[in-house]
Structures are given as structure tokens and as C-alpha cells.
């Protein structure tokens, strides 16, 4: 054979080799859809860069190919592999700081930048070896496949084989899991479980595509082809204590991933957010009390989607301006839910279908709550409540912090300072008030045996968390050395119920405030320290306050019924809330009230949340709004911040403005720390008192409307305190607003948040908005308006087309619930409006589920308002409509008819076009009509 023939054969062999390489890297099994690189499509990058992998030579010239056979067969220039824009780099050294040689030893690209912060210097090339996906095989709920690695990654204890399950959960929810098929790793099991179903594949709102080698997947919105998730942009890593998954984002408008001290829209400029529950007063760049691995994305055209990673281990989320996001978890599995919406409210509803709809709070819990660490005796506590009553400040619930407890031990009360605590509680009850006290999880372990039954009984019943040697782990909290109940143990939940029952038989509290339940400890891990192990010193620790996972909490090697604390830490508050809610339900046989500091997805089913130890300053006042709105997205509608602040001394002006804003938190409580100046409303000057009193009366007048919103949250997963973007998804201006918010779809709240301000620029989305105070209309095309805001005013506007039920306020909800109702009717340009009222006894369990409630629809049109009671149970029988205001009546009416009878008491203001009808007494349990005749 001649030289030419040899050359021809060589060329043909090379061509076949190259074609084989291209085929293997660009096509899928017969079950999977063929795709190119969505990353390349989105960023206009040459496609051939995704076909091969050719590791760079390290600086020390020692070649360490990860896939040598691939680099030999498909040798394409490394330059294009690393030619990646800085904002689109994905960090190859997240687990540790790497030198250039260490970076290149991993097969990654190294390209320093002038600034030390921001894009990584060590980053993945366009194609990086990882898992290879086998054929997709149908399963009862979708399809599954096996993922294998040809060679290990750079991580210790790499898992070489994974099981992928693609689950078509519902038409609007895609569920994907990645697990180790050879080992039972910890998986989160939410109390009450997660619903399981299978969607009709013909009607789903999404399509899925898989890249087989290296593995990645893409989720698209079926209606427009938009990429919702694309994980082909960076490698999947799955080791025993390090799980990493990256994805592009459909837009830069991202919210969620709490609990953090942030704006509502997250900063995507190389921001790192750690999800690891910690006793930490809110401040920037800190992991706080709760962990919620859920985010919602506002897409450019007003559509929205959400993503939930069901994982309770320590998680770090890296946001970058690509826009893109990287999940890094220290354990568990990858259990992803993608919610297709298509609108923001639907995304939240779909999310709550997985984690559970929120509980229905008792009506009284929507009133004003007052607390302070420093009410040191029952007499002091009595005087506070009496002074509030004497000064005509509405208040429903008096609280006590740990001052009540004997030697700061829970389930006791101090015999000297709080010896008549039971009598005081009964006095409050006779006045129509409620009483709540704090209940920390830590149980004192140093009392003389036989003198403190919670610990003695807990020892006998084996309910406490153990250390690595099997002994009770002892931490340190307020009473000193303490043991911690293991709420994942059913025996512990029964013991907890017994402790609450015994205490409740002496002190009939109406609810419980569960604090310090991250869980918090004043020593690192335990009083004896923690063992040196992979759990205490994992290969990778996210950026946590204190630098270690056991900082300010328990040892990670601590043993609980379900797993190690390493896996369960973020669930502690949720499991305690579940146990406390269940106990109160059985003991009181009424709707439980629980308030928790620590949180995790699903806690809204059992508890409300407050935002922790906020400082008394204007910045914290401002940031309280996005904090409250975040919890609305997380399925926790009963949420609020400590009005006037907890830490530091408030000022009169700050406290007035905070009480005005707090009047529109779904949960309103004034609470502060004992070293600080008192901040009860009555301690301030007369002008400030009048402003605070006005805010409280306004809140109490709106409680029927607020209660109805909570019903819709409980029954339909609607939000109560609502970001503007959820109601106006097609309005670009609404996307960024987090200094204003809505109650439901009807009320727009625009508080003063700056010191010394007497006016504010408020954004009014496209609509006609009426001032709640005087009915003045504002016709907005979606613009900012400068509104007067003197110290006695909070601007609240009613949206056209809505009817707001109100009730004459009183000093307690016990009294106000018997008062006449009133309606605010905000007419649209076409003269119509609609509203509703949910009403029951305010405290019985499952009234909606048991059909034991009243529900009334109000409609306005053709110059009349009509009520239509769709369901009645007697709760409204003695209540009447006392009057109504109609906003937007174009001209003065000649007369008013109520159920066909003329009404004499009415007024009309030509300047604001407001009709006010008074002196009515129309039964709320019957159909009524109020008509204005021109």
C-alpha cells in the first residue's frame, strides 16, 4: 500500500473517530430528547465548545487528564473552553481557595481579574467531565435513569452512581430527585407528609430535556419555550458531604431564599446566601433564624415560576449576574420542585400544595399584642395592661417573657414575683383579653432530682438529644446547663404535650411563644465540646456566623431519633412548632396560637413567625417590610416584626411610624429588651399617643377584612401581606417595590420610613386608588405621587372595584366582634365593586373544613350594593350593617333606599365624590340592598 493510501486510511480513521466523539456527546438515548446547548444559544457561543473536554496542563507540567481517552479522541483547543465572560463563570473552587496549579489540576480554567471580589478566578470550562446519564425508563410516576461517573471528581467521598427520578407531579409542578441508590441518605420528611400524584403528560405546562454526557437537564415553559432551568452550564457534583447544582435564571428579578436581612429582590452581583438557622439579630450577610430554600422568579413578560430544594442540611446559594444560581448543600439528596405558575400567586399556591397551606389563626390573635423582657412581676404586668385600657389603647393579648419562670426554667413560675400568675391570667380572661408566655426548648439539667419534673420525666422517657457517646447532650441557655428535647421522636412529642398540659392546668395560657429554637446555645456544641469528626468538621462549611456549623448551637454529631443533628438542625423549630401546635390543640380544644422564631418550609401550618431581635432604628424599620413579605412567599402569613424595635432605645417619632406600619403587619406585637427604655404607647407624648391610638383603631376596624384574607390563605393559599409584583405582574415598576405592600388585592399601604419625613413618594400601580381616610381618588397610570404624611397619618388606599368590610373598633376583639359592620365600597370607572366576608366564632377548630361558618359576598353595580349570604351558621345572627361609604359616586343622589325604604341619614361630598350612609341596622345574616337614586 502506498503512502497516499496510508494517509487516506489515517484520515478516514480520524474522521470516524471524530464523528463517534461528536455523536456520543451530542445525542441522547432513544427516550430522551436531543438538545444542543441552551447555554450557547442564550450567550451566542460556538457550539463545538460543548463537545469535548481537554484538561489544561498544570503549571508544574505534570499531565493529569481526568478523561484521557476523551482528550485523545476529541482534542479541541483549550482556549475556546475557557473563553467565558466573567459574569458567566461558575466557580470551580467553591469548596476551598485554590492556587493556579491546584485549579488547573482540577481541569479548570484560571484567569485572574483586577478585583478580588466578584467573578471566580478558577472556573469550569465549557465542558467538564461529570456524570453520564443512561437511558430513561418509564416509572409509575414519570421516568428514571442511572447516572454514572467514569472517574471520580475532586471531592472526597464522591458518589459514582446516582439515581435520577423525573416525576410529573402535577400539570404545573415538575419534581426531580437525585439520590445514591446504594445508600440510604437522609431525606426530609415534612410533618404530615408531601402529597404524591401524577400529572396528565398532555396537559403539563413544561417540557424537559436531558443532556446525557456530561449530564444536565433543561426545563422549559411549554407556552413560549422559555428556559426556566438549565443545569448544563456547570457540572453536577454529588459527594457524601457536598452536593452542587447550578442553573441559569430566566431573569434577574428573584426573591426568596430566606431568612436574610435583604431587600425583597435579591442582589445577583455575586451574592452568597447561607441557609442555616442561627440565633442572630438581623443584620447584613448573616444567616438568620430560618431557612427557606425556595425562590420565585418574575419573568420579563409578567409570568413567574418558582423552585424549591427540599433539603434541610446547611445550604449555600450563590447568585451571579449571568443571571444564574448555584446550590451547594452539605448533605442529604437533591430533591427539586419546579413550579410553573404561570402567575406569581399561582407559584405560591403550587409551592404550598407541597409544604402545606397555612393554619387559620384565632381571631383574637389579629389584635394588638404587648410584651417586654422586663415585666418582672405580676403587679408590673397588671399595671401595663390596665394602663393600656385606661388610656384607650386597643389591646388583646398581654405577654410575659422569661421573667415569669422560676430560675428561668420553663414550665415553672416564680413563687415570689409571679406567685399569683394563675389569678392574673383569669383576670385577663374576665376582661376579654388573652395571655401568652415564652417557652424555650432547653430544659434545665441541674435541678435537684425530684424537684423539676420536666427534666426528671424526660430522663425516664428518654426524650433528650444525645451526644456522640450516647449520653444526654448538655448545652447552656438561660437557666444554665440544659438538655434539648428531640422533637423528631414521637415519645418526645407526647412528653411535651404532658408538660404543657400540666402547666396549663395551673396557668391557662391561650398560646405559646417558642423562642431560642434554632436551637440556640451559649456554648459551641455542648459544655464538653464536640468530637473531631467529619460531621463537626465537614470538607466544606458554608459561610456561617461563627465559622462552624456548631457555633451557637448543638454538636453536629448529636443523635436524634431520625438522624444526626447535622441533617436535622434546620428542622428543629418546625418540629417543635408541630409538637406545640398539636399539644395545644388537644389540651385547649380550640384553634392553637404558636409563635416561633426558627422556621423551615411548612411551619405556616402550625405557627406564626416574628422576625427576631430587630434594632430600634430606621433602617430596621425599612427592612421589616421585605422580611414580612418574604414570609408571605414562604407560606407563613401570620408574621410581623417587633414594633418600635427590640434592641436599643426607640425614639418617639420612630415608634409612631413603626406602630403605624405595624398596624398593617399581619401579626402586630410591641416587644423590647429589658435594658432599654419602655416603649408602651402610653409612655410617649400626647401627640404621639394620639397617632398610635389612631393606628390601632384603624387596624381593629379592618380586622374583619384581615380575617377574611387569612381565610383565603388557609383555604386557597392566597397571600395576606402581598408584594405589589404579585398583584401587578405585568407592571415593570411593581417588580422592585418593597417599601409599600398590599393587604390582599385591595389595600395599598404606604408607610413613612424616613426620619423627619412629612410627605412621601408613593407608587400607585395602574388603577384608580381611593384614600381610605377620605375617599379622595387618585387616577394612576403607574406612577409615583407625592403624598402628605404628617406624624398622625399613614397613607392607605383602596383599589377600585373592591369592597372592604369593617367593624366598629373596641378595646378588645371580644368587644369589637359584637359591634356593627360597615362597608367601604370603591367603585370602578364602570361603577362596580366586589368584596366578601368570612365569619365564624373566631376560635373553633376546622370551621371551614366542617362547614361551620358564614360567608357573604358583597357586590356593587347599577347604583346599588347587594349582600348575598352564601353560607350561614348563626354566627352573624345578632350583627348588623351600621353604614357604608361609597367612593367614586359621580354626582349627588336624590335619595337612598335600604331594602326599599328611604334612608334619611346620608351625606355626599362633591369634592371627593364620596357618599356616606349611616344609621342603618340591616341584618348581616340576610340579603340586603342599599341603592342610591339620582
Enumerate the language-model features and the residues they cover.
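Extracellular Cys-Trp
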Residues: 94, 107-124
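Accessory, solvent-exposed terminal regions and/or long lumenal/extracellular loops of proteins
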Residues: 278-283, 793, 798-901, 918-925, ...
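N-terminal signal-anchor transmembrane helix specifying type II single-pass membrane topology
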Residues: 2-33
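Surface-exposed beta-strand/loop patches in extracellular or lumenal glycoproteins
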Residues: 180-182, 188, 192, 756-765, ...
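Catalytic-domain carbohydrate-binding cleft regions of carbohydrate-active enzymes
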Residues: 3-13, 40, 44, 48-55, ...
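Short, well-ordered beta-strand segments enriched in hydrophobic/aromatic residues
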Residues: 145-147, 166, 176-178, 205, ...
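Extracellular/luminal ectodomains and secreted, surface-exposed scaffolds of diverse proteins
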Residues: 110-115, 899-923
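A low-complexity, Ser/Thr/Gly/Pro-enriched, surface-exposed linker/loop concept
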Residues: 129-145, 158-203
Amino acid at each position: 500500500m502506498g503512502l497516499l493510501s496510508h494517509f487516506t486510511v489515517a484520515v478516514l480513521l480520524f474522521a470516524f473517530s471524530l464523528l463517534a466523539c461528536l455523536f456520543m456527546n451530542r445525542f441522547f438515548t432513544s427516550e430522551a430528547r436531543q438538545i444542543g446547548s441552551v447555554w450557547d444559544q442564550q450567550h451566542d457561543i460556538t457550539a463545538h465548545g460543548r463537545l469535548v473536554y481537554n484538561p489544561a496542563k498544570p503549571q508544574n507540567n505534570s499531565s493529569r487528564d481526568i478523561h484521557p481517552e476523551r482528550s485523545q479522541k476529541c482534542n479541541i483547543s483549550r482556549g475556546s473552553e475557557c473563553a467565558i465572560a466573567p459574569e458567566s463563570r461558575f466557580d470551580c473552587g467553591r469548596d476551598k481557595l485554590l492556587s493556579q496549579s491546584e485549579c488547573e489540576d482540577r481541569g479548570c480554567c484560571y484567569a485572574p481579574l483586577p478585583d478580588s471580589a466578584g467573578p471566580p478566578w478558577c472556573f469550569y470550562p465549557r465542558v467538564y467531565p461529570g456524570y453520564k446519564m443512561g437511558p430513561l425508563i418509564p416509572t409509575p410516576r414519570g421516568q428514571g435513569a442511572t447516572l454514572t461517573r467514569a472517574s471520580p471528581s475532586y471531592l472526597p467521598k464522591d458518589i459514582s452512581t446516582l439515581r435520577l427520578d423525573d416525576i410529573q407531579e402535577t400539570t404545573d409542578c415538575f419534581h426531580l430527585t437525585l439520590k445514591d441508590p446504594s445508600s440510604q441518605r437522609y431525606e426530609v420528611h415534612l410533618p404530615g407528609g408531601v402529597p404524591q400524584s401524577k400529572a396528565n403528560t398532555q396537559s403539563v405546562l413544561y417540557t424537559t430535556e436531558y443532556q446525557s454526557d456530561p449530564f444536565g437537564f433543561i426545563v422549559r415553559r411549554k407556552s413560549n419555550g422559555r428556559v426556566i432551568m438549565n443545569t448544563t452550564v456547570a457540572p453536577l457534583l454529588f459527594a457524601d458531604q457536598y452536593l452542587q447544582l447550578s442553573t441559569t435564571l430566566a431573569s434577574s428579578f428573584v426573591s426568596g431564599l430566606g431568612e436574610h436581612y435583604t431587600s425583597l429582590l435579591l442582589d445577583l452581583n455575586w451574592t452568597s446566601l447561607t441557609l442555616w438557622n442561627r440565633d442572630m439579630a438581623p443584620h447584613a450577610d448573616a444567616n438568620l433564624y430560618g431557612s427557606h430554600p425556595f425562590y420565585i422568579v418574575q419573568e420579563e413578560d409578567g409570568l413567574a415560576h418558582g423552585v424549591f430544594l427540599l433539603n434541610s442540611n446547611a445550604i449555600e446559594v450563590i447568585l451571579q449576574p449571568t443571571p444564574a444560581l448555584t446550590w451547594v448543600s452539605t448533605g442529604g439528596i437533591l430533591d427539586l420542585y419546579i413550579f410553573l405558575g404561570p402567575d406569581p400567586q399561582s407559584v405560591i399556591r403550587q409551592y404550598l400544595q407541597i409544604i402545606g397551606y397555612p393554619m387559620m389563626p384565632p381571631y383574637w390573635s389579629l389584635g394588638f399584642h404587648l410584651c417586654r423582657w422586663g415585666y418582672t412581676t405580676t403587679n408590673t404586668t397588671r399595671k401595663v395592661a390596665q394602663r393600656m385600657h385606661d388610656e384607650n389603647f386597643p389591646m388583646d393579648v398581654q405577654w410575659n417573657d422569661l421573667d415569669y419562670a422560676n430560675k428561668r426554667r420553663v414550665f415553672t413560675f416564680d413563687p415570689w414575683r409571679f406567685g399569683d400568675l394563675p389569678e392574673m391570667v383569669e383576670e385577663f380572661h374576665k376582661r376579654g383579653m388573652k395571655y401568652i408566655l415564652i417557652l424555650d426548648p432547653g430544659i434545665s439539667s441541674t435541678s435537684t432530682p425530684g424537684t423539676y419534673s420536666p427534666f426528671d420525666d424526660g430522663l425516664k422517657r428518654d426524650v433528650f438529644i444525645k451526644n456522640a457517646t450516647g449520653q444526654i447532650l448538655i448545652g447552656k441557655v438561660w437557666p444554665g446547663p440544659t438538655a434539648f428535647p428531640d422533637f423528631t421522636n414521637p415519645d418526645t412529642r407526647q412528653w411535651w404535650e404532658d408538660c404543657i398540659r400540666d402547666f396549663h392546668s395551673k396557668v391557662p395560657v391561650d398560646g405559646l411563644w417558642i423562642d431560642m429554637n434554632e436551637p440556640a446555645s451559649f456554648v459551641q456544641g455542648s459544655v464538653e465540646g464536640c468530637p473531631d469528626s467529619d460531621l463537626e468538621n465537614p470538607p466544606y462549611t458554608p459561610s456561617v456566623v461563627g465559622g462552624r456549623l456548631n457555633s451557637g448551637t448543638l454538636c453536629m454529631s448529636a443523635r436524634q431519633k431520625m438522624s444526626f443533628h447535622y441533617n436535622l438542625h434546620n428542622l428543629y423549630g418546625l418540629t417543635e412548632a408541630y409538637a406545640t401546635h398539636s399539644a395545644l390543640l388537644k389540651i385547649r380544644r380550640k384553634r392553637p396560637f404558636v409563635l416561633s422564631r426558627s422556621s423551615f418550609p411548612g411551619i405556616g401550618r402550625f405557627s406564626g413567625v416574628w422576625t427576631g431581635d430587630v434594632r430600634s432604628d430606621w433602617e430596621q424599620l425599612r427592612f421589616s417590610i421585605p422580611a414580612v413579605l418574604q414570609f408571605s412567599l414562604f407560606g407563613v402569613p401570620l408574621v410581623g416584626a417587633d414594633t418600635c424595635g427590640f434592641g436599643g432605645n426607640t425614639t418617639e417619632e420612630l415608634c409612631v411610624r413603626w406602630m403605624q406600619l405595624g398596624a398593617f403587619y399581619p401579626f402586630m406585637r410591641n416587644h423590647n429588651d429589658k435594658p432599654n427604655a419602655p416603649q408602651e404607647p402610653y409612655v410617649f407624648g400626647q401627640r404621639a399617643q394620639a397617632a398610635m391610638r389612631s393606628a390601632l383603631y384603624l387596624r381593629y376596624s379592618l380586622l374583619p377584612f384581615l380575617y377574611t384574607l387569612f381565610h383565603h390563605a388557609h383555604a386557597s393559599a392566597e397571600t395576606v401581606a402581598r408584594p405589589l409584583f404579585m398583584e401587578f405582574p405585568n407592571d415593570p415598576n411593581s417588580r422592585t417595590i418593597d417599601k409599600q405592600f398590599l393587604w390582599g388585592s385591595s389595600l395599598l399601604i404606604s408607610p413613612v420610613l424616613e426620619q423627619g419625613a412629612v410627605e412621601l413618594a408613593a407608587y400607585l400601580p395602574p388603577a384608580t386608588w381611593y384614600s381610605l381616610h377620605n375617599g379622595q381618588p387618585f387616577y394612576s397610570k403607574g406612577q409615583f405621587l407625592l403624598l402628605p404624611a404628617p406624624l398622625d397619618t399613614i397613607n392607605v388606599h383602596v383599589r377600585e372595584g373592591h369592597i372592604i368590610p369593617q367593624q366598629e373598633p373596641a378595646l378588645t376583639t371580644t368587644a369589637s366582634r359584637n359591634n356593627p359592620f360597615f362597608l367601604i365600597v370603591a367603585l370602578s370607572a364602570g361603577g362596580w365593586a366586589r368584596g366578601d366576608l368570612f365569619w365564624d366564632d373566631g376560635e373553633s377548630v376546622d370551621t371551614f373544613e366542617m362547614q361551620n361558618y358564614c360567608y357573604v359576598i358583597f357586590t356593587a353595580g347599577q347604583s346599588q350594593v347587594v349582600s348575598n349570604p352564601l353560607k350561614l351558621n348563626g354566627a352573624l345572627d345578632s350583627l348588623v350593617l351600621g353604614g357604608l361609604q361609597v367612593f367614586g359616586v359621580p354626582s349627588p343622589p336624590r335619595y337612598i333606599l335600604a331594602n326599599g325604604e328611604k334612608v334619611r341619614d346620608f351625606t355626599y361630598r362633591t369634592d371627593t365624590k364620596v357618599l356616606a350612609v349611616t344609621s342603618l341596622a340591616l341584618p348581616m345574616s340576610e340579603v340586603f340592598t342599599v341603592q342610591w337614586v339620582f
